[in-house]
Amino acid sequence: MIGNWNYGTGRRKSAVARVFIKAGKGDIIVNGKPIADYFSRETSLMIVRQPLELTNHGQTFDIKVNVTGGGETGQAGAVRHGITRALIDYDATLKPSLSTAGFVTRDAREVERKKVGLRKARRAKQFSKR
């Protein structure tokens, strides 16, 4: 807890989110913009709100987020992970329900590197029989 803010760091792919929550009326600000302006896809908004809806805290916290790196999906996942950790910092009794939903575990999948002699990570050059 930092002052009256609860803190959580979230990560997904190459995105990192620093999330601060405090009691309020449900405003979510991401990098200085309202969440609806920052995330253009409806699925991204849904991903971010999942831990709040699961714990029935949708309108009880003001959330301030700084997120860097990655694309829209990675950033949304990082924000969700950060909100989850901040909620656990606020109330540890929420951890079992968040954990069964799979929000506490960091998604460890990363982009596989490109290999020498191949076009992509696994895609080989086109083979010509003749």
UniProtKB/Swiss-Prot annotation:
Keywords, in A-Z order: Ribonucleoprotein, Ribosomal protein
Gene Ontology terms for molecular function: RNA binding; structural constituent of ribosome
InterPro entries: Ribosomal_Su5_D2-typ_SF (IPR020568), Ribosomal_uS9 (IPR000754), Ribosomal_uS9_bac/plastid (IPR023035), Ribosomal_uS9_CS (IPR020574), Ribsml_uS5_D2-typ_fold_subgr (IPR014721)
Top-level lineage group: Bacteria
Gene Ontology CC: cytosolic small ribosomal subunit
GO biological process: one example: translation
UniProt keyword Ribosomal protein, yes or no: yes
Family: Belongs to the universal ribosomal protein uS9 family.
NCBIfam families with a match to the protein in the record: PRK00132.1 (NF001099)
Protein name: Small ribosomal subunit protein uS9
